[in-house]
Amino acid sequence: MRMYDIIAKKRDGGTLNHEELSFAVNGYVAGDVPDYQMSALLMAIYLRGMTDEETAMLTDVMAHSGDMVDLSAIAGIKADKHSTGGVGDKTTLVIAPIVAACGVKIAKMSGRGLGHTGGTIDKMEAVPGTRTSLTQEEFFRQVNEIGISVIGQSGKIAVADKKMYALRDVTATVGCIPLIASSIMSKKLAAGSDAILLDVTMGDGAFMKDLDGALELARQMVAIGTAHGRKVAALITDMDKPLGHNIGNALEVAESMAVLQGKGPTDLTEVCLQLAGNMLVLAGKGDMPTCRKLAESVIADGSAFEKCCQMFAAQGGDISVLRDADKFQKAKYSYELTAPADGYIYKNDVEKIGNASALLGAGRIKKEDSIDFAAGITMHKKLGDYVKAGESICTFYADDESLFAAAVEMYRGGLVIRDEPPTLPPLVYARVTSDGVERF
């Protein structure tokens, strides 16, 4: 078998089989297939597409290119959730404790942030002392004992994905739905959970900018998971405005704790209840109305918040900051961005908000950048809100005053104020399961 023939077959619109995909992917991981040939295959896939069966086979090969985590040592159904990313996307810190408090095991591996999108592991490490690297034995023991652990992704899972993504990033082949679906699902399958809920974000601050693309990505990922015997569903959620009011690691942890204590922003609370409810449905806890009520009840009785504190304590975190957000270390400097005129916030580009937060030190511009956990933005006025000239739109936080100018310029570049209000998008557009699409 030759890589040349595999490239030519896909270039001409052919369908690759498992053996060919395995030869290409495993050869690339081993160093036998050079970058230029894998680049050519990725571009051929980008231009020609893949059948659902091909995408499922590619995902399987990628998943098996590294360690496959066997969670059978953990009793009961294990549930996982993946978000395709966004700004102010702090839902994992809310829904994982909710679901665990309802008796479903959460053994989750999460990632770090890059560019305008934040990462769950960075947010967790904003809680002083929190360990996000556990041995497998520690991870399993914690989930068996308290029902929940969230740790950083192992570099040994879906090894092919890391190499292939780095290549896609520099060869203009990132925006290909079969390649996005196989990248995400290879890691989810390797991580071993029985039930997987996918949060496919859509809008300015998301990778998928339109509903058709988001639905197709969701459909393909659900099909992959179902083909591999997992219970999978996806929600298409809005990312035309950040969730909640805070962007930045410690700021987002504080806001997440407010939701778990029943006093969080309504948009973030609603999306989290929908996500948690759907995870509970996948885990066999009942239909959606039943599971929604279950999720609401563990917030109301405080058990979800206590479950979150239990998780952080087990991983070495100082939970006093969870109980009292004022105990988080604060940024040295703040800056108020005020409205230039009266009117409605008609547009507030979410990617620019995320990039402004990163410029303040809350995110990474490059992978090796360090993070200032206290830095970030608190939004006082969001998309659709009315504002008066001179009124504060948001507060910027940083440990270096010189960072404000570039961040303010970035934020202002995406801000439009008009006399008429915009049409606000729904929080959740649709649910995608193996049975089809349910639009809301």
PLM regions with names:
Residues 1-88, 259, 309-314, 318, ...:
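Acidic, glycine/proline-rich low-complexity segments that act as flexible tails and inter-domain linkers
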